[in-house]
Amino acid sequence: MTATNELLQDLKARGLIAQCTADEELAEHLSTDCRTLYCGFDPTADSLHIGSLVPLLVLKRFQQAGHKPLALVGGATGLIGDPSFKAAERQLNTSDVVGDWVNKIRAQVSAFVDFNESKNGAEVVNNLDWIGEINVIEFMRDIGKHFSVNSMIQKESVKQRIDREGSGISFTEFSYMLLQSYDFAALNKAKECTLQIGGSDQWGNITGGIDLTRRMNRNKVFGLTLPLVTKSDGTKFGKTESGTIWLDPSKTSPYAFFQFWLGTADADVYDFLRFFTFLSVDEIAAFEESDKSVQGRPAGQGVLAKEVTRLVHGEEGLASSERITAALFSGDLASLTETDLAQLAQDGLPTTELEASEQTIVEVLTQSELAKSNKMAREFIGNGAVSVNGEKVADAEVILKKEDALFGKYSVIKRGKKLFNLYIWK
């Protein structure tokens, strides 16, 4: 399968391979047939966040090259929590909570791979289906006997926790490696799965699964890890001042998602294009070269925001994000739909809720903190710096009414070029 050779070369060119077991053997293994691979996603919240995008898209890349992807949702391992490189033990959640999260994450994963009836059609599996059937005696006898505690505590992910003063690691979390390792052995036996992918922090768990599969099934399997995405300024990827960037549009709106990528630093944008899009490496290199000579804002951020928003939220989500962005810039707020404004109310703009049916513009400016005092509010109005729903306000005595609001609910207040507040009439 020449597509596989091209895939591995492409992954390397994109910087998407951190570690790989027996890379030449893996290349040969993948080139001879349609192979089954998997990646695990533990339900630690009711949605995946953008940190999960790299492995999701790599599953998709393998499927495009002719291989069968399995997305494992950790209904069992999610009840325990992966200790890998964590400073402290995770809070344990109830089976009902984790079960609900599993269903939501299963639906999210399904948007990224093709569940057709062909040989390489994707599947979503839940490790509770096989781990939940094991009793304690079977676990200790059939799985635990294959693991050396000496080697387990030498794995860097565990060693850091043991060595950290005041931390330590519980037996519950220490056992996580055995459960994840058993996932690989179980999928190898039931689905002929021969490759596990995951973040570079999963290397210890992946190699544990490779060893267990060899011991239990007498089969050779492989592991490949992906780099953990970092930002050039040292801040955590996927976090903003307002919190985590989620894939679920009810937690992070398509507009806020689009804006996150639009705000990518110049030093990161081309790496992110290689990681998070299906544009070819040559196309990305051309953007990078072209942007070197551009006066003003480079094109890379806009391309990145469009490509990733389309992947996650579809054409409709991208269209609404671009429509909102253009309307806020131009002041043509009449072009916005009620759904667009609901996105702004969710997480796109600072908001102020109003119970009354009318309010003076001066009161609106001070209540929304666009002006620190009535005097300043009047000065801003006098200088032509204030608009409501795209219309300049020239008179400080103007009264805003609910009946004049967009869709009877929203008034977008703008002061200057970039300061906004969304008034929500109750």
Curated annotation (Swiss-Prot):
Subunit structure: Homodimer.
Motif interval(s): 'KMSKS' region: 236-240
Chain location of the short sequence motif 'HIGH' region per the record: 43-52
Protein name (Swiss-Prot/TrEMBL): Tyrosine--tRNA ligase
Binding-site residues for L-tyrosine, renumbered to this chain: 38, 176, 180
All residue ranges annotated as the S4 RNA-binding domain in the record: 359-426
Pfam families on file: SYY_C-terminal, tRNA-synt_1b
Catalysis: reaction(s): tRNA(Tyr) + L-tyrosine + ATP = L-tyrosyl-tRNA(Tyr) + AMP + diphosphate + H(+)
Family the entry assigns: Belongs to the class-I aminoacyl-tRNA synthetase family. TyrS type 1 subfamily.
